[in-house]
Regions:
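Positively charged n-region of N-terminal signal peptides that target proteins for export
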Residues: 1-5
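Bacterial N-terminal signal peptides
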Residues: 9-19
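An acidic-aromatic pocket/loop used at catalytic or ligand-binding sites
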Residues: 22
Length: 162
């Protein structure tokens, strides 16, 4: 993964001050918010479909510092996508969520605005997230020229038993 520039590092540092890592307790619903920044690769499968992988890092409530991989398929004519968020916390616990998304152009050439709605998978998540449920919305910008993305997410997560 490419090194993040100072602007991205600064943005993550600001969010770190706002998004203190916590933990969920059985039966409690908690906010799930954070930010991410990373690199994007895409491979054309056919004229209408790209296979895209985001490899990023960030900080979030409930996760703390994390790495995330986001493999997904993009339907180019409709600008829609479907795939998975695979968060890995510093201790190795994993939070998995399926998502669908929509991309729209911005006023900046080569930069796309993306909104993705994700649902946490209680069966695929591990460690303290095993059995957890919830959902979140990711809003991010994708710079197709630089091959980078930066964004934030907000939602809720509940521990097993909720």
């Amino acid at each position: 993964m490419k090194r993040f520039d100072s602007a991205i590092s600064f943005a993550l540092a600001v969010v770190a001050g706002l998004a203190l890592a916590g933990s969920t307790h059985a039966g409690d619903a908690a906010p799930f918010t954070g930010s991410l920044a990373g690199d994007v690769t895409h491979t054309s499968i056919d004229p209408q479909t790209d296979y895209v992988v985001v490899e990023a890092a960030g900080i979030a409530t409930q996760l703390g510092l994390f790495e995330v991989t986001v493999p997904h398929l993009v339907d180019l004519p409709t600008r829609t996508a479907a795939g998975y968020y695979e968060f890995t916390a510093a201790n190795g616990d994993r939070l998995i969520a399926s998502f669908t998304g929509l991309a729209t152009p911005t006023a900046t050439p080569g930069v796309i605005s993306i909104v993705e709605t994700a649902t946490i998978d209680p069966d695929l998540s591990t460690g303290r997230f095993a059995g957890a449920s919830g959902s979140f919305v990711v809003e991010r910008l994708y710079d197709r020229v630089a091959g980078t993305t930066i964004g934030s997410f907000k939602g809720t997560i509940s521990a097993p038993g909720e």
